[in-house]
Amino acid sequence: MNPRPTFVRDLMTPDVVTLDRNEKLVVADDVMRLGRIRHLPIVDSDGSLAGIVSQRDLFHSGLLKALGYGTHAQANMLDLLSVKEAMKTEVVTTTPDTPLVEAAKLMIERKIGCLVVLDGQKIAGILTEGDFVKLVAEG
């Protein structure tokens, strides 16, 4: 029997899919759909964290919402816009050594679905609400 996870490093997903800030939103949409990913950290050319895009951000992208022309218009806009135009630049982060209880409280307080895990300036992983659900389900 495995010991119960205590720290972020014990529960996080270490192999994080990231995308460059200059990629088109259509690429982000494809990566998220095909990889069944809901949160995608966005990086600068040097690999440092620049922002985050969620499925909700893609769906509610300001221009798409304003246009309201349906799925065809949405597909066209995803081809035209870059990730940097839809990403959130204020990313809530944590460290691998943060206790899981603190991380969970932070997610609840900030009403967010994930924390990007940084080890120094390097992305070490991602911790999502899905990770917590799995933890509870597995007992």
Task: Report the location of each language-model feature.
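Tandem CBS (Bateman) regulatory domains
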Residues: 1-15, 54-91, 104-108, 128-139
